[in-house]
Regions:
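N-terminal "arm"/small-domain region of PLP-dependent enzymes with the aminotransferase-like
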Residues: 4-82, 88-89
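Short, function-defining helix-loop hinge/capping sites that tune catalysis or transport
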Residues: 44, 229-230
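Conserved core of the PLP fold type I
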Residues: 69-214, 225-229
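Residue-level marker for buried hydrophobic side chains located in beta-strands
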Residues: 218-219
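Walker B catalytic acidic pair
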Residues: 222
Length: 230
């Protein structure tokens, strides 16, 4: 075929072939097809084998999302749209800014720290290649947070907790002066173990931080965001 001889064609012939291929590509785009190129996913006939369990209580089981995704199969990377929308409504953010993982937030935080060590954050140097990595730890705080940074050998810096949240004078000073400080643990509402809720002023000061490190991150573990509703 002609593909095997591209290196023998003249410039004019190559241009003609390019025009032809673009026309074929345009026709494919116009056909409005949706192809799932992922591998290892069960077919619909296999998924239907479980319908007896799906329908045992309700014969009208609805397993499709609003965009037609079959929830009986492997999930979407960022979560099904309905779950993203629900969490977006609760957290008052756009669903495009929501990723629905599994139900273990500590795993997400651990994986995020781990990836920062092995691959870096948004193109910055992987933390494993740095001489020193430091972390701000409001105290008293959640011991499971501290165990993550301890596991990676991070130098943890205690920040006193006030009645309205962490000592922000100290936080602002430390992060602005030391680029080795890469993050801070936060439980902004009903902090573990004191039950302190960060004030609006503290939250605004967090949002306005000017860290020396481009890859500084606030780990905002808002686990109890809606508990007051119950």
């Amino acid at each position: 075929g002609i593909m095997a001889g591209y290196n023998t064609l003249s410039k004019e012939q190559l241009n003609e072939e390019l025009v032809k291929l673009k026309e074929e590509y345009a026709k494919i785009l116009e056909s409005d097809i949706s192809l799932d190129m992922s591998r290892g996913k069960p077919g619909e006939d296999q998924l239907n084998l479980s319908m007896g369990m799906m329908n045992v209580l309700d014969g009208n089981s609805d397993y499709k999302t609003t965009v037609g995704f079959d929830c009986r199969n492997y999930g979407l990377l960022d979560g099904i749209p309905e779950a993203k929308q629900m969490m977006a409504d609760i957290m008052e953010v756009s669903p495009e800014n929501v990723i629905v993982f599994g139900n273990a937030s500590l795993n997400i935080m651990y994986d995020t720290v781990s990836r920062s060590f092995t691959h870096g954050v948004l193109g910055e140097t992987p933390w494993c290649k740095l001489d020193k990595v430091k972390w701000l730890c409001p105290v008293p705080g959640y011991d499971r947070h501290f165990s993550i940074t301890e596991f990676f050998g991070v130098e943890m810096i205690n920040v006193p907790m006030n009645e309205d949240g962490p000592d922000m004078d100290m936080v602002e000073k430390l992060v602005s002066e030391d680029e080795a400080i890469k993050g801070i643990w936060c439980v902004p509402k009903y902090a573990n173990p004191t039950g302190v809720a960060y004030s609006d002023e503290v939250v605004r000061r967090f949002a306005a931080l000017k860290p020396a490190a481009k890859d500084f991150r606030i780990f905002w573990d808002n686990a109890y965001a809606i508990h007051h509703l119950y």
